[in-house]
Amino acid sequence: MIEFVYPHTHLVAGVDEVGRGPLVGAVVTAAVILDPARPIVGLNDSKKLSEKRRLALYDEIKEKALSWSLGRAEPHEIDELNILHATMLAMQRAVAGLHIAPEYVLIDGNRCPALPVPSMAVVKGDSRVAEISAASILAKVTRDAEMAALDIIFPQYGFAQHKGYPTAFHLEKLAQYGATAHHRRSFAPVKRALELAS
């Protein structure tokens, strides 16, 4: 992996998203400015960490970061805008929610939303940039908790297990029970289920 070279600035925010692929729920983003005086050991892409480790880091990031913020785009916004534009909106909301204005923003992936400060997209940033790794952890823990809460209301869909992604089990239950109000109606499998139900 090519070592990432940071921009020459102090207040760098990292931004990442979770939940572009699922058929249900919001896309959740986070923005994090880390404190160089309070390093956090073991930051890595949230998908590579165990749930226990993620939860421990989640608490540590919230405690030690100079500033952190969550952003989101709800299913109806995803349906209105499309998933890419809704993700960009959620990222803008996360950055706007920081109580300290960053001087530079590093975003996981290959494109940046329009922001009032300079920004750069970093491919595989969640495993190369500590701030993006931290954002990835906050976003994933938050969204996973939302899926667990939704699972209590709709136990038949198995949201706690598949987190809303289009697994064979989820698609089977979608066909069997139809879509909930939390499903993304513009996504093809949900659209099909709605057409079958009508």
Curated annotation (Swiss-Prot):
<feature type="binding site">
    <location>
        <position position="108"/>
    </location>
    <ligand>
        <name>a divalent metal cation</name>
    </ligand>
</feature>
<dbReference type="InterPro" id="IPR001352">
    <property type="entry name" value="RNase_HII/HIII"/>
</dbReference>
<dbReference type="GO" id="GO:0006298">
    <property type="term" value="P:mismatch repair"/>
</dbReference>
<dbReference type="GO" id="GO:0003723">
    <property type="term" value="F:RNA binding"/>
</dbReference>
<protein>
    <recommendedName>
        <fullName>Ribonuclease HII</fullName>
        <ecNumber>3.1.26.4</ecNumber>
    </recommendedName>
</protein>
<comment type="similarity">
    <text>Belongs to the RNase HII family.</text>
</comment>
<dbReference type="InterPro" id="IPR022898">
    <property type="entry name" value="RNase_HII"/>
</dbReference>
<dbReference type="GO" id="GO:0043137">
    <property type="term" value="P:DNA replication, removal of RNA primer"/>
</dbReference>
<keyword id="KW-0464">Manganese</keyword>
<keyword id="KW-0378">Hydrolase</keyword>
<dbReference type="InterPro" id="IPR024567">
    <property type="entry name" value="RNase_HII/HIII_dom"/>
</dbReference>
<dbReference type="GO" id="GO:0005737">
    <property type="term" value="C:cytoplasm"/>
</dbReference>
<feature type="domain" description="RNase H type-2">
    <location>
        <begin position="10"/>
        <end position="198"/>
    </location>
</feature>
<dbReference type="InterPro" id="IPR012337">
    <property type="entry name" value="RNaseH-like_sf"/>
</dbReference>
<feature type="binding site">
    <location>
        <position position="16"/>
    </location>
    <ligand>
        <name>a divalent metal cation</name>
    </ligand>
</feature>
<dbReference type="Pfam" id="PF01351">
    <property type="entry name" value="RNase_HII"/>
</dbReference>
<keyword id="KW-0479">Metal-binding</keyword>
<keyword id="KW-0255">Endonuclease</keyword>
<keyword id="KW-0540">Nuclease</keyword>
<comment type="function">
    <text>Endonuclease that specifically degrades the RNA of RNA-DNA hybrids.</text>
</comment>
<dbReference type="GO" id="GO:0032299">
    <property type="term" value="C:ribonuclease H2 complex"/>
</dbReference>
<dbReference type="GO" id="GO:0030145">
    <property type="term" value="F:manganese ion binding"/>
</dbReference>
<feature type="binding site">
    <location>
        <position position="17"/>
    </location>
    <ligand>
        <name>a divalent metal cation</name>
    </ligand>
</feature>
<dbReference type="GO" id="GO:0004523">
    <property type="term" value="F:RNA-DNA hybrid ribonuclease activity"/>
</dbReference>
<dbReference type="InterPro" id="IPR036397">
    <property type="entry name" value="RNaseH_sf"/>
</dbReference>
<keyword id="KW-0963">Cytoplasm</keyword>
